[in-house]
């Protein structure tokens, strides 16, 4: 699979405890089939962070890749926005 055709997502880092692994929450909105109300859906992905550069509350871009472990199928592409100091 070529790199430019791989799925890229943007989300917020919720955990950076593991070595070279971060947990990223990706938010999307769906529309209810019958009532057409939009609602929020969030999904968490385990992401490979080779250099341990991402911190909690950073906004990051991730890209789909080959399976790196049982749960990791994404890798970190870039940190879009660093978290503010003191932010929880």
Curated annotation (Swiss-Prot):
One of its GO terms (biological process) is translation. One of the primary rRNA binding proteins, it binds specifically to the 5'-end of 16S ribosomal RNA. Pfam families: Ribosomal_S17 (PF00366). The lineage of its organism: Bacteria, Bacillati, Mycoplasmatota, Mycoplasmoidales, Metamycoplasmataceae. The keyword Nucleotide-binding does not apply. This is Small ribosomal subunit protein uS17. InterPro entries: NA-bd_OB-fold, Ribosomal_uS17, Ribosomal_uS17_bact/chlr. Keywords: Ribonucleoprotein, Ribosomal protein, RNA-binding, rRNA-binding. The keyword Flavoprotein does not apply. GO terms for molecular function: rRNA binding; structural constituent of ribosome.
